[in-house]
């Protein structure tokens, strides 16, 4: 009877198809502890794609229970009891966020039910059913710059007073063993070795339909994920289905302290392409069969653990490279890529000092952007976004970031997190001097805000016409730059409820944000009454001097509006209890 009830919940989840996950959700505290266990070398073979199915979670926890010290085993046993001790956990969460000096606030309340059940050793299901009462949608959440809501909320148009009532149903099923498994569900995804804001697939993007296949052997792992995305136009609106991303990777572990891998990605839309389902294929070559209609990227990763507790990670992700210039060692070449490098030291044994992490991320100009049609109002199926949010790094193109994070654990269940994040960003369009590009920018509607929606191409009715910076990489060479510094302090108390296997999670967080030149992320150029009719005229008919004069006027106006200072304070208090 119990199996029939669980199967009924599974079928209901697949039918409703409107949610995000629970016990294997990428923000579960389990994954934070897993990163610590990976840092000290207790775990060296976890797959790159998260979330993991219950089969893999059980394997990882059993390793810690067997090999960890007293404190590590205590945490692992608490997780084990929560995931595998009871089928259902019922609870609720409440969250209050205040942003000052704007005097804005965000309220979230949600009862929920968690489900973790093994119908068979080879077949597991998990999920979270919840109903949110909130005064903010996903796009309205009060978060620091370049961060996004962790709640998967879609506007359903139902209100109780001033509160939106939004159902969220996150679910997943898995078939297989820890060595070979296939998962299907709706959840957020992250792709290592940097899971927080991965340049491959970042956890900041709202949940997606996901189909994941993994082969995990002692010396190597093959990961493959097919995600169903939401397309938007180049202004972030007009949400449309039919956008997909396929990403696969091969990770090699010749030694316990060394791993490296290659990652291959294709993003496309308006059709389902079976050839991209083939494992161990090269997407760039595969799309060549159809005259290269899609957007392919390729990357590489490495992890080195030279001594216990010390971990070095790195990755590069190439979007579009000027290969002919690069192989000739020419100074000026097209480099559209992102990368992240980090060093972490984790205390090998349970200690009041848990870890310190320093990492650097860059996103070169036009990385993750892509031309897909001559009109900014039509869906873009090839840029690296989902539902209007960056799918890879949470940074915009032409940005970089350095981040220091430190975690203290003075008592069991009590975490004190301190971090400082410094971000630079500049609008690539400030460097545009080409007269053809300037003429189009001031006479036709384009996105010129320097975001992932701002591609390098100008168009006519026949498609692409010209491209910016084909033979150079003006990374952070602009006159007007945005500087953001975020100092974050957080206290978190996470305690198990021994009797039921549930948990209590309380958090109090504060972020001080300094934002210098906040208007950099606004459009620089736009058509107006002065340029009316220019789109149908040639540069000769208009006059180059007249075009440059109008472009200079708009650029000067943008610079005046971009410069300034803002200081923001974010205070967040949350409580979550599951019994």
Predicted feature locations:
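Outer-membrane beta-barrel channel domains
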Residues: 22-28, 39-259, 330, 350, ...
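C-terminal beta-signal and adjacent terminal beta-strands/loops
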Residues: 499, 504-556
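Sec-dependent N-terminal signal peptides
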Residues: 4-14
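Extracellular loop and loop/strand-boundary signature of outer-membrane beta-barrel proteins
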Residues: 99-100, 154-159, 195-199, 233-238, ...
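Signature for the C-terminal beta-barrel architecture of outer-membrane proteins
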Residues: 181, 190, 202, 208-389, ...
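Sec/Tat signal peptide C-region and signal peptidase I cleavage site
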Residues: 16-20
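Outer-membrane beta-barrel "beta-signal"
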Residues: 493-495, 565-579
């Amino acid at each position: 009877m119990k199996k029939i009830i669980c199967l009924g919940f599974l079928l209901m989840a697949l039918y409703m198809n409107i949610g995000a996950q629970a016990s294997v959700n990428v923000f579960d505290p389990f994954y934070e502890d897993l990163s610590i266990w990976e840092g000290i070398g207790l775990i060296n073979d976890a797959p790159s794609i998260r979330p993991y199915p219950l089969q893999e979670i059980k394997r990882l926890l059993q390793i810690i229970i067997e090999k960890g010290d007293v404190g590590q085993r205590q945490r692992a046993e608490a997780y084990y009891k929560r995931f595998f001790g009871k089928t259902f956990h019922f609870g609720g969460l409440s969250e209050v966020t205040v942003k000052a000096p704007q005097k804005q606030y965000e309220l979230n309340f949600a009862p929920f039910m968690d489900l973790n059940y093994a119908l068979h050793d080879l077949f597991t299901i998990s999920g979270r059913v919840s109903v949110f009462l909130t005064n903010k949608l996903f796009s309205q959440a009060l978060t620091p710059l370049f961060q996004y809501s962790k709640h998967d909320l879609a506007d359903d148009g139902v209100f109780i007073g001033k509160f939106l009532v939004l159902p969220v149903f996150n679910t997943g099923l898995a078939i297989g063993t820890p060595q070979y498994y296939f998962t299907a569900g709706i959840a957020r995804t992250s792709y290592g070795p940097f899971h927080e804001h991965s340049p491959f697939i970042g956890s900041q993007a709202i949940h997606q339909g996901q189909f994941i296949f993994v082969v995990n052997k002692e010396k190597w792992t093959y990961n493959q994920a097919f995600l169903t995305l939401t397309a938007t136009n180049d202004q972030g609106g007009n949400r449309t289905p039919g956008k997909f991303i396929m990403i696969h990777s091969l990770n090699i572990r010749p030694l316990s302290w060394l791993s490296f891998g290659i990652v291959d990605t294709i993003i496309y839309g308006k059709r389902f392409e079976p050839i991209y389902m083939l494992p161990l294929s090269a997407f760039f070559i595969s799309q060549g069969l159809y005259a290269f209609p899609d957007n392919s990227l390729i990357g590489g990763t490495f992890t080195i653990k030279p001594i216990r507790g010390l971990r070095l990670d790195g990755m590069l992700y190439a979007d579009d490279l000027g290969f002919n210039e690069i192989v000739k060692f020419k100074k000026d070449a097209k480099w559209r890529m992102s990368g992240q490098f980090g060093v972490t030291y984790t205390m090998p044994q349970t200690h009041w000092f848990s870890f310190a992490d320093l990492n650097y991320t860059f996103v070169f100009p036009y990385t993750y952007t892509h031309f897909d049609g001559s009109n900014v109002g039509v869906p873009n199926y090839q840029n690296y976004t989902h539902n209007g949010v960056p799918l890879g790094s949470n940074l915009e193109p032409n940005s970089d970031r350095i981040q220091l994070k430190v975690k203290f654990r003075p008592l069991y269940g009590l975490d004190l997190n301190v971090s400082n994040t410094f971000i630079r960003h500049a609008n690539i369009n400030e460097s545009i001097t080409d007269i053809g590009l300037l003429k189009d920018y001031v006479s036709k509607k384009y996105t010129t805000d320097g975001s992932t929606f701002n591609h390098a191409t100008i168009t006519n009715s026949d498609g692409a016409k010209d491209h910016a910076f084909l033979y150079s990489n003006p990374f952070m060479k602009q006159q007007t730059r945005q500087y953001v510094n975020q100092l974050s302090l957080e206290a978190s108390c996470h305690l198990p409820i021994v009797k039921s296997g549930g948990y209590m999670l309380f958090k109090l967080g504060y972020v001080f944000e300094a934002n210098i030149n906040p208007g950099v992320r606004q459009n620089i150029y736009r058509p107006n009454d002065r340029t009316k009719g220019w789109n149908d005229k040639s540069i000769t008919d208009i006059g180059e001097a007249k075009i440059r004069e109008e472009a200079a006027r708009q650029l000067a106006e943008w610079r005046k509006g971009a410069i300034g200072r803002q200081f923001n304070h974010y205070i967040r208090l949350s409580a979550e209890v599951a019994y």
